[in-house]
Swiss-Prot record:
Pfam families: CC_BshC (PF24850), Rossmann-like_BshC (PF10079)
Source organism per UniProt: Lysinibacillus sphaericus (strain C3-41)
Enzyme Commission (EC) number: 6.-.-.-
Task performed by this protein: Involved in bacillithiol (BSH) biosynthesis. May catalyze the last step of the pathway, the addition of cysteine to glucosamine malate (GlcN-Mal) to generate BSH.
Name of the protein: Putative cysteine ligase BshC
Length: 538
C-alpha cells in the first residue's frame, strides 16, 4: 500500500475557513486546531477531573458481547484511571455505512495515538454509535457497481414506524439475501467466500441494526482497542439521567442561545445548518422504540402528532426515573457527550463542523467548555486496476474529480461515430422527403385529399430512419465497449454520484479485493489531521 497526500480545493466554506487562520469562523469555537489547543484543553480536563469507573463499567458491559480485545481492555483500564478520550460517532449504517464511517474511526484512533505521545498522557479512542437515530432510510442501503451501472442496493425490510436503529430488529433472511446481492455485484475473488461467511456469521449473532454495526466495527478495529458505546444503550441512558435533568432545566436558555448563535453564523456568511427555533426542547421522547421530537409551548413539552404533553416537572421525573425514554437531538447530543466523557477532541465531518458552530454558547449555559473540533481524515482508495487505467490514459485522480474522464469518454464516443453512415441516412431522408413532396403535389392536382395519410406515412419512415441511426450508433459503441468501459470505471470508482468515493461505497468491496488485512494496512500509514486528502493505492 502506498499513501499520497494531495491538496484539494475545499468546497465547504465552513471547513475551508476552519483550516485558515484569522477567519470569522473561529469565533464560533473555543479552540483552533493546534498543539497549544490540545495542551490547554488537557489542562482544563485535569482541573475538572471526574470519577470514570461507572462509565468504564458501562462501556465494558456493552462491549463484552462483541468480544473484548486485549487492547480494548487496556484502554478501559486507562479510562477508569482518568484517561482523556478522542471521540467520534456515526449512525449504525448497514455494512458499516459509507467508507467515511471507517475513515472517522481511523481518524479517532490516529489522533488518540498522536496526542498520547505529545501530551505524555493516556488518551483513548471512543466511537459513539448513534443508535438512537430513527431515519432508517439513511442507513438501510449501500451502492455497488453492477456491470457499468451504479446500483443502490437496499435492505428490503421496511418499518412504517420511526423506530430507533437500536430498537429495529433485523430480518436475518432478508439481510442474508442483501449481503449475497451486494457481494455478487462486487465480483468473485479469492477472498469472497470467507467474506460472505464472516458477514453472515456476524449477522447471525446480531439482533438490530446497531448490534450488526457494532459487531462489524469491533471486528475491524479490535486490534486498535477502539471503544464502542451505543447512545441508546439502556445502562448508558441510566448513567445520563442527571445530565438529562440539566438539559431540561436549561431548555429555554439552550434553545435561545443556539438560535441567536445560528443567526450570527448566518450573518457571518455560513448559513443556517440546523434551523434552530426558540421553541425547541432539543430532546426526543421514546415510546415503544419510536422517537418523537418535543417542543416547548406554554410551559409544556409537547408533540401534538404523537399526542404527547408533559409539564416540566413530569419530564424531570422521567429523566430521573426512566431516562431510557429520552433521546438527544443534534443540539443536545454534543452537550450530553461532554457531560459524559472527558473529551479532549471530537472528530467530525464538514456537516458536523457546521452545526457545532452554533453550540458554543449552549455549552456555556451548562457550565461546560466546548472541546476541540478535529475534522476527520478524507481518503480515496485507488485499486490496482484503477491505477493502471489512470496511467493508461495519463490521468490523475483529481483529473477524474474535475470531470476529465467524462470529457474524454464523450470525445471518444463522438470521434468513433460513423459519420458516413449518418450522412447516407440523412441523404436518404432528404430524397424521400422530396419524393413525398412530389407525390403530395400530384395528389392535390388530382383533388385526392390524402394529406393526413401522407404525413403519417412520412412520420413512420422518419421513425425508422431514427431507429436505424440509433442501431448503427449502438453497434459502434458495442464495438468500442472495452475503451468506453475504462472511462466509466474511472468515474464510478473515483467520483460516483458526482461525489467522493467515501460518501458512496462501503468498505467491504475493498476487503473483497485486498483482503481482511486492509484496515491494518491502512492504519500503518502515516496520517495527520489537516486539510489534505489522502490517496491510498492498494
Amino acid at each position: 500500500m502506498k499513501l499520497e497526500s494531495i491538496q484539494v480545493p475545499i468546497k465547504n466554506n465552513v471547513l475551508a475557513d476552519y483550516w485558515s487562520p484569522n477567519t470569522a469562523i473561529h469565533q464560533f469555537f473555543e479552540y483552533e486546531f493546534n498543539d497549544q489547543a490540545f495542551e490547554k484543553r488537557a489542562k482544563h480536563l485535569a482541573q475538572h477531573a471526574r470519577d470514570q469507573k461507572e462509565l468504564t463499567a458501562i462501556i465494558r458491559q456493552f462491549m463484552e458481547p462483541l468480544g473484548l480485545s486485549q487492547k480494548a481492555n487496556e484502554h478501559l483500564q486507562q479510562l477508569e484511571q482518568g484517561a482523556m478520550v478522542i471521540i467520534g460517532g456515526q449512525q449504525a449504517g448497514i455494512l458499516t455505512g459509507p467508507l467515511y464511517s471507517v475513515h472517522k474511526a481511523i481518524s479517532v484512533i490516529v489522533l488518540a495515538k498522536e496526542q498520547s505521545v505529545k501530551l505524555q498522557r493516556s488518551v483513548v479512542p471512543v466511537f459513539w454509535i448513534a443508535g438512537e437515530d430513527h431515519d432508517l432510510e439513511e442507513i438501510n442501503h449501500t451502492y455497488t457497481v453492477h456491470g457499468e451501472l451504479l446500483k443502490k442496493r437496499a435492505y428490503s425490510e421496511r418499518s412504517r414506524r420511526k423506530t430507533m436503529a437500536s430498537a429495529t430488529m433485523l430480518n436475518k433472511e432478508s439481510m442474508t439475501q442483501f449481503i449475497h446481492t451486494v457481494v455478487r455485484d462486487i465480483g468473485e475473488t479469492e477472498y469472497t467466500e470467507a467474506l460472505i461467511k464472516q458477514l453472515v456469521d456476524v449477522l447471525n449473532e446480531s439482533e438490530t441494526f446497531t448490534d450488526f454495526f457494532a459487531r462489524l466495527m469491533n471486528q475491524l478495529f479490535k486490534d486498535e482497542g477502539l471503544l464502542l458505546i451505543d447512545a441508546a444503550d439502556y445502562n448508558f441512558r441510566q448513567y445520563e439521567s442527571t445530565n438529562f435533568t440539566h438539559i431540561i432545566q436549561h431548555s429555554e436558555e439552550i434553545a435561545r442561545v443556539v438560535t441567536e448563535k445560528e443567526e450570527q453564523l448566518e450573518r457571518t456568511g455560513y448559513g443556517k445548518p440546523i434551523l434552530a427555533t426558540r421553541e425547541a426542547a432539543n430532546l426526543f421522547y421514546v415510546e415503544d422504540g419510536e422517537r418523537h421530537l418535543l417542543e416547548r409551548k406554554n410551559d409544556l413539552f409537547i408533540n401534538l402528532a404523537a399526542n404527547l404533553k408533559f409539564t416540566r416537572e413530569e419530564l424531570l421525573e422521567i429523566a430521573e426515573k426512566y431516562p431510557e425514554r429520552l433521546s438527544n437531538n443534534v443540539v443536545s447530543r454534543p452537550l450530553m457527550q461532554e457531560m459524559t466523557f472527558p473529551v479532549l477532541a471530537f472528530v467530525g465531518g464538514p456537516g458536523e463542523l457546521a452545526y457545532w458552530a452554533t453550540l458554543k454558547s449552549a455549552f456555556s449555559v451548562l457550565d461546560l467548555q466546548m472541546p476541540i473540533f478535529a475534522p476527520r481524515l478524507h481518503m480515496t482508495i485507488v485499486t490496482r486496476h484503477v491505477e493502471q487505467l489512470l496511467r493508461e490514459h495519463q490521468l490523475s485522480v483529481t483529473d477524474v474529480w474535475n470531470g476529465k474522464a467524462l470529457e474524454m469518454k464523450e470525445r471518444f464516443i463522438h470521434d468513433v461515430q460513423d459519420i458516413e453512415a449518418k450522412r447516407q441516412i440523412q441523404a436518404m431522408e432528404q430524397l424521400l422527403a422530396e419524393k413525398y413532396s412530389e407525390l403530395a403535389s400530384y395528389l392535390e392536382e388530382q383533388h385526392l385529399t390524402l394529406d393526413k395519410i401522407l404525413v403519417k406515412n412520412q412520420e413512420n419512415h422518419a421513425k425508422q430512419f431514427d431507429y436505424l441511426q440509433q442501431k448503427i450508433e449502438q453497434t459502434v459503441l458495442d464495438k468500442h465497449e472495452t475503451t468506453i468501459r475504462k472511462f466509466t470505471t474511472l468515474q464510478n470508482e473515483l467520483y460516483p454520484n458526482e461525489g467522493f468515493q467515501e460518501r458512496t461505497y462501503n468498505p467491504y468491496q475493498y476487503f473483497n479485493e485486498f483482503g481482511p488485512m486492509l484496515i491494518a494496512e491502512m492504519l500503518k500509514q502515516n496520517y495527520s489531521i489537516g486539510k489534505h486528502h489522502y490517496l491510498l493505492y492498494l
